Amino acid sequence: SPKKYDVIHSMEVLYYLEDPSKIIKKISDSWLNDGGRLIVGLDHYYENKDSHSWEEDVGTPMLMLKAKEWVRIFEMAGLEEVESWHANKSADWAGTLVITGKK
């Protein structure tokens, strides 16, 4: 069986996937130790209006979800103690959406 981990981190990756719920479920089911934690950082999300043009700007498909939709994906994957917050938020930046959940 594959090696399992206590912490898995992803930064600026999941919105490039057509269906990120599949990999989040795989991480939860197969890659995390019991009690392990998934931590994800995203700058491309609905509440970050500055990111709305990115897909067109760079010519790459990007999935646009609301923060609560990302949280729901974590919960549907079986992760517990799911939390989210906006890191490095400022007057002119919505911040990085950070979501974490525990197996």
Could you describe each region identified by the protein language model?
Residues 1-3:
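Short conserved loop adjoining the S-adenosyl-L-methionine
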Residues 9:
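A conserved beta-strand element that flanks and buttresses the S-adenosyl-L-methionine
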Residues 12-13:
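Short catalytic micro-motifs in class I SAM-dependent methyltransferases
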Residues 16-27:
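A short, conserved alpha-helix within the catalytic core of class I
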Residues 35-43:
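Conserved beta-strand signature within the Rossmann-like core of class I S-adenosyl-L-methionine
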Residues 43-62:
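Short, glycine-/aromatic-enriched active-site segment of Class I SAM-dependent methyltransferases
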Residues 61-78:
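Short alpha-helix
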Residues 77-79, 83-103:
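Core SAM-dependent methyltransferase catalytic element
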